[in-house]
């Protein structure tokens, strides 16, 4: 449990650091180099790049904040469950009743718990699932966009060719060797590492997004899937998606704002409210 709590502290710090570095690289290196023009200070291509980048990052950070600000904890629980040392449930959660779980990391009872997200430091459940999915979508988009811009910068600044599909398989090991031999600068080596970080985070976020969308459409949570259980509130895929994304889901695709009414405190009341 101590390792999980440590991870709960390290993961958000890693996210904040990666975000700051990404902003710095885009505005201090990538934008001035790739979109520079001798005629005007700011050209249409630069404005388009800045707009796209800020839109993607703004939505990623906005949904990240909304995921944290809308916890799925139960407001009606006054007694904190105590698990025995030989508790058969997973190490990070203990199943109670009616779709409720006690998270051993959060020390809270979570309504319709899906999983504990270490990057946000809280559990994903009925109230913040929409924001978590949109956070995953925009995080993957931001990272993959940064990957493309980073490749363009390395091509322009260091004449690295990415025409060969095998370049990504050899770039990191070769750059590591060249760096320790003193053949490339620390900045170039750092940028190569960032390419792989963006690629890794982007692909993982895409995987999370696809998994969560599938589970939401089936009306199932990750906790239920692991135990081979069907949802206690199973409905049609359209109703399940509406429960999470709301009737104004189109707005939520572009702006990190609430698009579904929730009745905090009790999942059964919330579910009955949504299906009245």
Curated annotation (Swiss-Prot):
InterPro entries xrefs: Palmitoyltrfase_DHHC, PFA4/ZDH16/20/ERF2-like
Top-level EC class: transferase
A single Gene Ontology CC term: endoplasmic reticulum membrane
Membrane topology: Multi-pass membrane protein
Keyword annotations from UniProtKB, A to Z: Acyltransferase, Endoplasmic reticulum, Golgi apparatus, Lipoprotein, Membrane, Palmitate, Transferase, Transmembrane, Transmembrane helix
Positions of the DHHC domain: 101-137
Subcellular location per the Swiss-Prot or TrEMBL entry: Endoplasmic reticulum membrane; Golgi apparatus membrane
Disulphide bridges, residue numbers: none
Positions of transmembrane segments: 10-30, 46-66, 132-152, 166-186, 189-209
Predominant location: endoplasmic reticulum
EC number: 2.3.1.225
Cytoplasmic side: 1-9, 67-131, 187-188
Sequence similarity: Belongs to the DHHC palmitoyltransferase family.
Domains (record comment): The DHHC domain is required for palmitoyltransferase activity.
Protein's job: Palmitoyltransferase that could catalyze the addition of palmitate onto various protein substrates and be involved in a variety of cellular processes.
The protein, known as: Palmitoyltransferase ZDHHC22
Organism: Danio rerio (Zebrafish)
Gene (UniProt): zdhhc22
């Amino acid at each position: 449990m101590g390792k999980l709590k440590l991870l709960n502290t390290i993961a958000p710090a890693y996210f904040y650091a990666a975000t700051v570095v990404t902003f710095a690289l885009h505005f201090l290196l990538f934008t001035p180099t790739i979109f520079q023009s001798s005629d005007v200070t700011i050209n249409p291509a630069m404005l388009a790049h800045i707009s796209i980048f800020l839109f993607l990052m703004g939505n990623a950070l906005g949904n990240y904040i909304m995921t944290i600000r809308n916890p799925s904890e139960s407001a009606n629980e006054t007694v904190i469950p105590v698990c025995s040392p030989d508790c058969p449930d997973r190490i990070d959660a203990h199943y109670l009743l009616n779709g409720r779980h006690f998270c051993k990391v959060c020390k809270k009872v979570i309504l319709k718990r899906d999983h504990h997200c270490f990057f946000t430091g809280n559990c994903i459940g009925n109230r913040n699932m929409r924001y978590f999915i949109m956070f995953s979508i925009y995080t993957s988009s931001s990272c993959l966009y940064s990957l493309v811009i980073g490749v363009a910068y390395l091509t322009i600044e260091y004449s690295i060719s990415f025409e060969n599909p095998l370049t990504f398989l050899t770039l990191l090991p070769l750059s590591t060797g060249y760096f320790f031999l003193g053949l490339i600068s620390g900045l170039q080596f750092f940028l190569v590492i960032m390419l792989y970080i963006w690629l890794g985070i982007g692909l993982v976020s895409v995987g999370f997004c696809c998994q969560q969308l599938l589970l939401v459409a089936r009306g199932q949570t990750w906790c239920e899937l692991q135990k081979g259980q069907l949802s206690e509130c199973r409905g049609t895929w359209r109703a399940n998606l509406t429960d999470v994304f709301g009737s104004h889901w189109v707005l939520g695709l572009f702006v990190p704002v609430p698009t579904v009414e929730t009745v905090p405190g009790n999942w059964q009341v919330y579910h009955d409210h949504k299906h009245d």
